[in-house]
Amino acid sequence: MSDIKVRFAPSPTGFMHIGNTRTALFNWLLAKKLGGKFMLRIDDTDKLRSKKEYEDAMRESLKWLGFEWGEEARQSARFERYDELRDKLIAEGRIYACYDSPEELEIKRKRAMAKGQAPIYDRQALKYTADDLAKFKAEGRKPHYRFKLVDEVIEWDDIVRGHCKYEASKLSDPIIIREDGSYLYHFPSCVDDSDFGITHIVRGEDHVTNTAAQIQMFKAIGGKVPTFAHLPLLTGTEGKLSKRLGSLGVRELKAEGVEPMAICSFLAKLGTSDAIEPYYTLDELAESLDFEKLGRSQPKFDEEELKRFNTKFVRSMPYELVANRIPVSKEFWEKVKPNLDVVEDIRVWNNICNDVVVPVMEDRELTEIAASVLPPEPWDDTTFNAWLNEVKAKSGKKGKELFHPIRKALTALENGPELKTLLPLIGYEKTLMRLKGIKA
């Protein structure tokens, strides 16, 4: 086991979606490839929006995807630690109170924009007089708190983006504590990453500017700065950030029959120079992980493409991966899987071919003709069409009048798998009996 340690830190304010699934996946694969540890951290500082049902659903989704973890923490249990370091940094002048109202901040932002300037906080709060503070108190204002950035060039080597450089003077001091005393993302995340020994942080590129500020936070609290990897964000098929990507849930995909390893294979290779091909274990997928193959452009995620890939995935799945899920033999699975879209479809085939079917007799005259000309086995790919043509010639029926009564007799279903493929799997004896209206 190496010293490498990563974390997946979801906020339980909604269900697992494609975006954070991809983040969890890359973290897990990195830990697995480097022989490190994967930690789950519940970022539940938002007391109003955090819900246990979301947290439980996230755990369920992570386990279904195959991600394992040996350590976990939750931020709501660590407020004393955050407060301890907050007080230390206030005393050192690195965290300071601000009484600007949202309206006042918006006015400042618009003024800066009108002048063609970046809307950087002007640090007016550092110039408060005793009279100012007395006035704010009399008005009942409560402060929010900012982290004071040191004027320097902040640099790091990003696994995905390469060398990154930001001038702290061109960044606003980030707000880290709200007026109600609750913490925003930045500060608790740094404290946790430092305390739990996180060595690598893999997350979306929307956090890049956060990283610049957080590097200074790590140093301010005496922590070691981790290695960062910022993944390009997924877009919809139209090339824009899509609300659908934030709502398309793992639970929804699971309900639609999308396989967990199909999701992982697809997301791991989307936007890379590798072809999107089926991987049947996370270990195998982890071995193929190479951040250098990850492009800088934002990959387009297409839900329908994922489902098509899932069909390809299912049709090449080894029997060993489904043996404990479906009540069929290996021989039957291998014969039928080229016709499946999702694994659960096998149950329809199994019911028709291996279970007892009560025929629905829609046209006895037709099915009696069909029974009378049913050829003996062995059957090959030409048998069905030759047999059907003979039934057609003898009955004078065609189209739906020909197909439908035979389907209902053989399967008792209105619709279903192709009869041409089904017939050899049902076999001569059962086919003959069902055509005669006998339960078989």
Describe every region a protein language model picked out.
Residues 8-12, 42-44, 191, 195, ...:
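Short, histidine-centered active-site or binding-site loop motifs used for metal coordination
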Residues 10-16, 201, 390-396:
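A short glycine/serine-rich beta->alpha loop
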Residues 97, 101-230, 235-241, 249-252, ...:
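Active-site cores that bind ATP or allylic diphosphates and position pyrophosphate for catalysis
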Residues 362-410, 414:
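C-terminal accessory/binding modules appended to enzymatic or scaffolding proteins
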